[in-house]
Amino acid sequence: MNDLSRPPEAVSASRLAAFVERCADTIIRRRKLLMLLCVAVTLALGLSATRLKLDPGFNKMIPMQHPYMQVFERYAGAFPGANTILVSLRWKGDGDIYNQTFMDALRHATDDVFFIPGVNRSRVFSLFTPNVHYTEVTEAGFRGDVVVPGQFSSSNPDDLAKVRRNVARSGQIGRLVGNDLKSALIRAELRETDPATGKRLDYSAVARQLEEIRARYAKQGIDVNIIGFAKLVGDVESGIAGVMAFFALAFLVTAALLFAYTRSLKTTALALVVALLPVVWLLGALPLLGLGIDPMSILVPFLIFSIGVSHAVQMTNAWKQALVRGASPVDAARDAFRKLFVPGTVALLTNALGFMVIMRIRIDIVRELGITACLGVLLMIVTNKVFLPILLSYTRLERGTLARAQRTAAAGGSGRWSRFAVFARPAPALGVFAVALALLAYGTLESRKLEIGDIGTGAPELRANSRYNIDNAAITHQYNIGVDVLSVIVETTGFDDACLHYPVMSAIERFEMNMRGVAGVQSVTSVSSQGKVFIAAFNEGNPRWAALPRSSDGLTQGSNAFDPDNGMNTANCKAIQVLIYTKNHEGTTIAHIVDEIRRFAAENPTPNVAFRLAGGNVGVMAATNEAVGDAEIAMLLSIFGAIALLCAVTFRSWRAVLCIVVPLTLVSILCNAVMALLGIGLKVATLPVITLGVGVGVDYGIYLYERLQHDLRHGATLPDAFADAMRQRGTAALFTAVTMFIGVGTWAFSALKFQVDMGVLLAFMFLVNLFGAVFLLPALAAWLGVERAERRVQQAHAQPSPVAPATLKPSPALEPGNPVR
């Protein structure tokens, strides 16, 4: 009988085993050369890692392919403002801001902000900038000037009184001056590149200079509040020191638990070193690829370390079991490689595919995260599957540790793993299914409450009591505007000057009035409302005339409001922006406002007038939220499809695919439910966590099923095979899950809220994925007929074949295994 008459599962298993055997022999035979090569690569990439820099960027956070962002880019030159910083000075003394101390501080603070590198100096607004002016009606006609005259002296009471009158006439109360006249605002817009250097703007440097401004004027009896993307990046970066501290704590916790688990200093050190190697290689490779690391993806190296620990523990555990059976360190290393190369590599490739799937979201920061994580996992195949067996081949286990393990093995090992065999029997499996179905029903219902976008006010990346969020609350309370603004672009065609055509202005007026009544909107500004102020002024300031005339001549009276220099429209009003200031930037608020804009545009069509979304930072958030929402289902389908494909290719069994994928699917649904319960929104920072959790969680199922399949094909029953799989692979999997659960659990005390959220979600997925593999996988195997299917493959494999690899050694039905104790 030849290979053509044997089932493909048997043929592929033989060929794969022969390939693995050849690889094991090659690695052991050339271990000195390979070890020197790995050491050289480590030194070179370690040196390269010293050149790694933090690389934040505003445009990296934006889905530039989204229709909203195409509109945003089209009018970025005419209507900038998505990347804005607000600096508010609040007088803490008696009276209001019209005193010498405060006005001097405001003047100097305006200059300080003006000269920050990267600030668009034509877009700085303050009482002391020449682009802020007032207009009044006199007996001689209109008169206007800058709010603060050029010869202003803060020590002159008459000048202070004049500025007070000018501010009242300028309409800046609630905008650049607080509603209670106790604070004043400096608003500036940033460029993405520094004009002086031509390089990407250094947001860290901008944040440091803003903090210097705060410190300088806080000494003068003034409260300084600062918000904006640059300041947020600075606060996140300042929290990175805490992130590194938590990484160090997690490392120490992992080391302590690993030593308690292995009772071996040597294997503990080897596992930690090999788990750190892909992190070092990754950090060294990024500068060579022209990449940095964004503050929002600073957690990726720890994920790589966690995955590395998981696979290193499996390898050292298999090596130790071989030593217990009497093998030499070299033979034990070869045996460990032979057993774990296939499941370990498949698990890592699955992780890498999961990270690649993240790149479906067309946002640069997410794609960089996917590239970084994928590269780190691929490097781990070399460090864990090649370098670690080489190191183990040179290592001798401590005599006391080896003797203890041999005594345990001689006593029959620990009986606790045999208890798990009950879940591989049909009757108890029904109980597992009942619990799983109940969790599925609850998770499905609860996950429907999951919101897309931010939840809560302020910056969700930081805690509610952080300085940034306190500043945000103060500015939102004191002014009618904030940093959260949505810009709607009104495009006009076929008009010489659209602002002088009543149908156009009427459509904008009706749109503005409609949006003022929308929940979540704080205030609305447009050329329509500003034009009505000037028209009333033309008529002796009579408020009854604050309306839109139906003739072009009448609208001409408001032409001062239609000046492109005001930043509200382009020449001839070909494009007009309507600014909608929102009360917050929660995902539900943004979605509701966007829906209302679309509804108005659909129900109120105006010839040659189109309402286009969107600009402003809220427009960016709207595009990002929609991109995340659109990508969620596609991402999950892609990653589960990739996992299913790899499992099908590896195990040649649809039953194996279901046994591994079904628990992962349940955990993903439960993860969404946990996010909804904890008030964590689905956004750029959290969506990758779900994918990462699935990628890491699949390791447990692959390792357990591979051993289960091996024992079944050598004559074991399903319960016995699963008990042995738990003995040989489950110990390490359980340790890894608990260790990573504790490690990321410490993130709950971080100052960075996004690290807290990621820690909670990862801890949940690490632990619950293990439960899925331990309880649901054997239950599915019991009812899917895995034992019968593998028995058929075994029988076909046992039939004689003229082509049999001479190097393959028959394995016993159940190789002795012992927990590492």
What are these regions (language model features)?
Residues 77, 104, 153-265, 276, ...:
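Extracytoplasmic
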Residues 303-324, 344, 351, 386-387, ...:
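Short helical (or helix-break) motifs at transmembrane helix termini and adjacent helical loops
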Residues 322-349, 712-735:
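Helix-loop junctions and hydrophobic alpha-helical segments within the transmembrane domains
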Residues 241-293, 360-364, 635-680, 749:
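Interfacial segments of transmembrane alpha-helices in multi-pass membrane proteins
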